[in-house]
């Protein structure tokens, strides 16, 4: 197969590993800088050009679209879909998962366990919003944040009110979530490919920190997940419409709670921690399921 990898940087671990794994399995791998691909949206022959030439003959595309280029990246991916190229994850699913609030609304509708989450616009509603999530301590998250940036733990009601007011004053969209104390600053990253959890790891926040993101100094270790956690991760990825996803789960007193469903999960942490060839499994999934016009939306965007 001829497979495009949409990535800003061919030197990134995840991009390198996907290219390696694909090449090892006999595929032609082409890394395309997402922001340098440009489109001709013609009615009969949609095209993508790259460095002055049209991109042609691709069987599949692997999007590694960073959060900051979601809008343009999804447009490029959608154009590939219009051309009948099979995407590892569809543009609609990626756009959906990048909107944290929309994701939680979709997951809650399907009855998937979530931390109690509040969202409000007016400062007048702050006291009731705080009560809604069972009061302090609570967590405040900027909707557009990634890698643990813009996530604040407020220990007291007073602190929570000040932080929420500050964010609202800056016109930042935020959500307020109950703090799951029993998780002890740890979460579980379940790596879903197709309808299986192919690898999972525990991420423990460093002492004095509650954010377990590896970018924030969290430490990863092996973990055996429960059947309930496995089912939750697979269902969450399915609800979002993602074939490949990193589902972050907290262990709470009332079962697994989904924190986030990531459409472009990094491979380094999970491969190094588990020793599994995750990149190879992703390519294998493409081989089994990919093909012209095989997208769930059948290439209609």
Curated annotation (Swiss-Prot):
Residues bound to Mg(2+) 2: 260, 262
Record flagged with keyword Acetylation: no
Top EC class for this record: ligase
Gene Ontology CC annotation, any one: cytoplasm
Binding site for Mn(2+) 1: 248, 260
GO MF annotation, one: metal ion binding
Cofactor (UniProt): Mg(2+); Mn(2+)
Family: Belongs to the RimK family.
Protein name: Probable alpha-L-glutamate ligase
UniProt source species: Pseudomonas putida (strain W619)
Gene: rimK
């Amino acid at each position: 197969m001829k497979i495009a990898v949409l990535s800003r940087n061919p030197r990134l671990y995840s991009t390198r590993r996907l290219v390696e794994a694909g090449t090892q399995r006999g595929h032609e791998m082409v890394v395309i800088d997402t922001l340098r691909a440009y489109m001709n949206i013609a009615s009969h022959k949609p095209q993508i050009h790259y460095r002055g030439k049209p991109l042609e003959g691709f069987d599949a595309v692997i999007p590694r679209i960073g959060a900051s280029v979601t809008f343009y990246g999804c447009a490029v991916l959608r154009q590939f879909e219009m051309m009948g190229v099979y995407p590892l994850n569809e543009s609609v699913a990626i756009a959906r998962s990048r909107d944290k609030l929309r994701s939680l609304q979709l997951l809650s509708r399907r009855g998937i366990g979530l931390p109690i989450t509040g969202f409000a616009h007016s400062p007048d509603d702050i006291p009731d919003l705080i009560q809604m999530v069972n009061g302090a301590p609570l967590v405040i998250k900027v909707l557009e944040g990634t890698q643990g940036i813009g996530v604040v733990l407020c220990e007291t009601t007073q602190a929570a009110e000040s932080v929420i007011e500050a964010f609202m004053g800056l016109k930042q969209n935020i959500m307020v979530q109950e703090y799951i104390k029993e998780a002890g600053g740890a979460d579980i990253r379940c790596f879903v490919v197709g309808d299986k959890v192919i690898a999972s790891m525990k991420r423990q926040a460093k002492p004095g920190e509650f954010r377990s993101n590896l970018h924030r100094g969290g430490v990863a270790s092996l973990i055996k997940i429960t059947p309930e956690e496995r089912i939750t991760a697979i269902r969450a990825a399915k609800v979002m419409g993602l074939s490949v996803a990193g589902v972050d789960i907290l262990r709470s007193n009332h079962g697994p709670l989904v924190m986030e469903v990531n459409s472009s999960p990094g491979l380094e942490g999970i491969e190094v921690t588990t020793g599994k060839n995750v990149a190879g499994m992703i390519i294998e999934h493409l081989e089994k399921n990919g093909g012209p016009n095989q997208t769930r939306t059948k290439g209609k965007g």
